[in-house]
Amino acid sequence: MHGEADRPSETQRLKAHEMKSTLLLLALCATAQAAPPASFFRALHVVETGGRTGAIIGDQGRALGPLQIHRAYHADSRVAGDYSRVADLDYSKRVVSAYLQRYAPAAWAAGDVVTLARIHNGGPRGASKPATVAYGDKVARLAK
């Protein structure tokens, strides 16, 4: 038979509960920071500039860099740094990540490539615009 000594104390039970709560919180935080697959950024890069890098000017002079970022998009991303830095692919990825996490957190967490691509292309409400359907599908095909 088990005696009193075999039962966990109140302190042990509280510590176990705290540990479970902490692990749950960490799991939730990890999920919130989930990201689309790396293939999403490669596909976006190919669709936007054919995979070229540098200070590529597009959209009649309104977009810059390998991911074709507009000034307003850069500002909306809230990433520190001068707009000219979007010519750098790594910086552009940070800008796109911040923008999409701001305007499409659920799609970001789910890795919803189509929705993310459509918002990248059409702005915060881009996922509901018929004009972005083909763009989203193209990025999704290339991301597979």
Language-model segments: what does each one mean?
Residues 15-16, 29, 141:
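Short hotspots in intrinsically disordered terminal tails
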Residues 6-9, 24, 39:
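Residue-level detector of alpha-helix boundary/anchor positions
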Residues 20-21, 96:
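A short alpha-helix capping/helix-coil boundary motif
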Residues 5, 33-34:
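Compositionally biased, intrinsically disordered/low-complexity regions enriched for serine, proline
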Residues 4-18:
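Short, Lys/Arg-enriched N-terminal segments with co-localized hydrophobic residues
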Residues 34-144:
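Catalytic glycan-binding domains that act on GlcNAc-containing polysaccharides
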Residues 21-31:
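Sec-dependent N-terminal signal peptides
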